[in-house]
């Protein structure tokens, strides 16, 4: 038998255990500062937000990991979102934070990308413990996955912590609508 510990909601929220509002738990400290990143793709090439493919585009930046069950649920949706909106100016960037074994042997990451048909930019950003150092502009970045929505001007316009799995029914369907709606709103804006 496995032991479980219950925590009252107010105590959990106070200690950061569970987000009380998934759209506000993780936020960008200074909205005037652009989202910056630097990480390696699966070929070992360094990619940053200044890469020409991102210029003037709306970005969905996903903090993910191949070890994270909800990241497995979110990846196919992000691939679908990318295919639907890339022609309108959307780029999706995964910043994957992996354990030492995955960093040493990229086959698991390659299998993750292949399994979900990921054709958006997939970068290896470091270990989970380095997330605060690699993404210093974020506050309360302590749950996987976390997704940032970045306007054409490079500034964070929204974030979402966690991902409601397909088994959650209406929660999942609503989250898909929310993500799509925010992407459409950002795409409609001219930078």
PLM features: residue spans?
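Short, internal strand/loop/helix patches
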Residues: 110-146, 150-152
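N-proximal helix/coil linker or "cap" segments that precede and/or mark the start of modular domains
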Residues: 2-40, 52-56
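Hydrophobic beta-strand anchors of alpha/beta hydrolase catalytic cores
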Residues: 60-61, 92, 147
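Thiol-/selenol-based redox modules, centered on thioredoxin-like
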Residues: 20, 143-191
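Structural microenvironment flanking redox-active thiols in thiol-disulfide oxidoreductases
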Residues: 73-116, 127-134
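Short pre-active-site segment immediately N-terminal to redox-active cysteine/selenocysteine motifs
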Residues: 57-59, 64-67, 74, 99, ...
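A short beta-strand-turn-helix
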Residues: 37-59, 82-85
């Amino acid at each position: 038998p496995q032991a479980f510990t219950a925590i009252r909601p107010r105590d959990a929220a106070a200690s950061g255990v569970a987000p009380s509002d998934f759209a506000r738990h993780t936020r960008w400290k200074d909205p005037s500062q652009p989202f910056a990143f630097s990480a390696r793709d699966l070929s070992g090439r360094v990619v940053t937000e200044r890469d020409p493919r991102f210029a003037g585009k709306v970005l969905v930046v996903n903090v993910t990991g191949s070890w994270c069950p909800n990241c497995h649920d979110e990846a196919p949706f992000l691939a679908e979102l990318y295919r639907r909106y890339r022609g309108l100016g959307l780029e999706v960037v995964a910043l994957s934070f992996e354990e030492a074994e995955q960093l040493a042997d990229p086959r698991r990451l390659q299998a993750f990308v292949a399994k979900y048909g990921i054709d958006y930019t997939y970068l290896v950003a470091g270990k989970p413990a380095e997330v605060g150092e690699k993404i210093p502009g974020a506050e309360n970045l302590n749950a996987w996955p976390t997704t940032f929505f970045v306007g054409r001007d490079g500034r964070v316009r929204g974030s979402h912590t966690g991902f409601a799995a397909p088994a959650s029914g209406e929660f999942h369907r609503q989250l898909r609508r929310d993500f799509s709606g925010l992407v459409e709103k950002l795409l409609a804006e001219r930078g």
